[in-house]
Amino acid sequence: MIGDMNELLLKSVEVLPPLPDTVSKLRKYVSEANSNIETMKVAEIISSDPLMMAKLLQLANSPYYGFTREITTINQVITLLGVGNIINIVMADSIRDNFKIDVSPYGLNTQNFLKTCNEEATFIANWLNDEDKKLSHLLVPCAMLLRLGIVIFSNFLIQNHKDKDFLAFLNKSENLALAENEFLGVDHISFLGFLLHRWNFDDVLIESICFVRTPHAAREKVKKSAYALAITDHLFAPHDGSSPFNAKAAVALLKEAKTQGINFDLNNLLSKLPNKAKEN
């Protein structure tokens, strides 16, 4: 993948904003503590960054996690979500805040795009919280970043005056992955896998992203998360998410997962489909 990637795009990755110091401190502590991680120490590191602490509490009380009572302390957040998920959430949130967003090169309305990105994360939570809360907690940060590649690609295309050519090619081909590979040497989902690896995200998250298009080929440990993201990717595809074709493809993926020994509740998925998909 990286061998085919546009060289200028690779260079632009080198100057992406660094992650906050708090994330570096958390990572360093977890790495040094190994299995002897203390909740109080993690809370102490997070509490040294009031903005991050406030955002974590806000996210913990959002619909993403569906807790029935209000979460009021960082210790509660750490106990309920686990240190690994906390680090993923903090990283995902700080990354999202670092980018100027203009997705006009894709022919998309930026406000609608942002709304859909939030709906993706909410969908993962609503769909999986009842049947696999652990998987839901793992995938919410990933869903928050699922379209980050589109944001970075858009900025790159605009800066290099290729945005109009890209959109013309996209409109003509009606094939998003083809257009991205033609102009950038990689599609936005594969590029996200590359970025998560570069930022040292959790290995399971990285692998889940890398197998979104081929979940059946993922190793057993990540197969269920890869299928969950693949289903979400179909339902919220940037240009034709929730179309009759994509809604049927999402259900077909769930049935395919069953042949791989991965069980999702079909009725639960059907009841949690986005409204547009239900209409179809």
Regions found by a protein language model. Give the residues of each.
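Terminal helices and disordered tails flanking the catalytic cores of nucleotide-processing hydrolases
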Residues: 1-8, 256-280
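Conserved alpha-helical "signature site"
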Residues: 1-145, 151-159, 183-185, 190-245
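Cytosolic terminal low-complexity segments enriched in Ser/Thr and acidic residues
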Residues: 247-250, 256
